[in-house]
Design a protein with these regions (language model features):
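Terminal helix/beta-alpha structural elements that buttress the NAD(P)+-binding lobe
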Residues: 1-188
Length: 188
């Protein structure tokens, strides 16, 4: 299961998981993003968390439970996924998109009991920890992109004046794929 599955990170994670043989379930917000997950990124199933009853939708999409959860959101989405975690499950934390701030410390369901009874592992993933493998990753990704196995979507806005609105739009979930700001025209 991958949260923010239609975004820049989630879409790549889901596609790579599919390439290596995993069954993939994406969670995204809105019908267009769910369609993108299925049709463009090849997720086996996709769930619209905004459509309500996320718990029931997860049970339907993951009848055998969840072995691996790539968490880009934290918060209520993650709380729902953890209820479906299998014994020995693994949670990779890459982002906390649903949390506007960590001050004060957010309150809500705690994960410790889920991890304990499921004998699960939760670990942070920070890309900089793998700098020594960038060359290897770049070669694999380039091969997959050239072969049509990994697709991506970019939205490029021209001008630094668009940066504040672009960032605010990310937090409102308005982006489809990676949102970029081109500061100046490319030199010719």
């Amino acid at each position: 299961v991958v949260s923010t599955a239609a975004g820049a990170v989630g879409s790549c994670v889901g596609q790579i998981a599919g390439i290596v043989g995993c069954r993939t379930v994406g969670i995204a917000g809105g019908a267009e993003k769910v369609r993108l997950c299925r049709e463009a990124y090849g997720f086996d199933a996709a769930i619209d968390y905004k459509a309500g009853d996320l718990d029931a939708r997860l049970a339907e999409a993951c009848p055998g439970g969840v072995d691996v959860y790539f968490d880009n959101t934290s918060g209520a989405i993650s709380d729902a996924v953890l209820r479906h975690l299998n014994v020995g499950g693994r949670v990779v934390i890459c982002g906390t998109a649903s949390m506007a701030s960590w001050e004060p410390w957010p309150q809500g369901p705690r994960v410790e009991r889920h991890l304990l009874v499921k004998r699960a592992r939760m670990q942070g993933f920070v890309i900089f920890d793998y700098a020594s493998r960038y060359g290897e990753a770049l070669a694999a990704l380039a091969h997959w992109v050239r072969g049509g196995l990994v697709r991506y979507r970019e939205e490029i806005l021209d001008g630094l004046e668009h940066a504040p609105g672009a960032i605010a739009g990310l937090y409102r979930g308005e982006n489809l794929g990676r949102r970029l700001i081109r500061i100046a025209p490319e030199a010719t």
